[in-house]
Amino acid sequence: MTEQAEDALPIRFTDAAASKVKTLLEEEENDALKLRVYVTGGGCSGFQYGFTFDEKINEGDYTVEKQGVQLVVDPMSLQYLVGGEVDYTSGLEGSRFFVKNPNATTTCGCGASFSV
């Protein structure tokens, strides 16, 4: 996929996130798993992000493939994530997947919840 084509996607899946998913799937020995990102009500800012591994792609789900692994987003969550990026970081504060969301008007200190 070209950089221009990747920029046109509703949500981006970084190399760091895809690489970590690939490593985790190899450890689990289950290539059918996909990283699902979703938005639910809650958290200190109104909405919160969630991540889980899922074997299914449901009707209407949006998928992005990178490095042979898939990111899956349900249509309801996608409307809050358009233009965003799913990334992965590892540092002194620990390791985690996170969302860079240009639609968030406020976020909490830990970055796990947001409002629009």
From Swiss-Prot:
Cofactor: iron-sulfur cluster
Transmembrane residue ranges: none
GO biological process terms held by the UniProt record: iron-sulfur cluster assembly
UniProt keyword Iron, yes or no: yes
Signal sequence, start to end: none
Gene Ontology CC terms, in alphabetical order: cytosol
Binding-site positions, iron-sulfur cluster: 44, 108, 110
Gene3D superfamilies, A to Z: HesB-like domain (2.60.300.12)
Metal-binding in keyword set: yes
Keywords linked to the UniProt accession: Iron, Iron-sulfur, Metal-binding
Superkingdom classification of source: Bacteria
Co-factor remark: Binds 1 iron-sulfur cluster per subunit.
UniProt GO MF annotations: 2 iron, 2 sulfur cluster binding; 4 iron, 4 sulfur cluster binding; iron ion binding
Task of the protein: Required for insertion of 4Fe-4S clusters for at least IspG.
Family under the similarity heading: Belongs to the HesB/IscA family.
Subunit structure: Homodimer.
Protein name per its UniProtKB record: Iron-sulfur cluster insertion protein ErpA
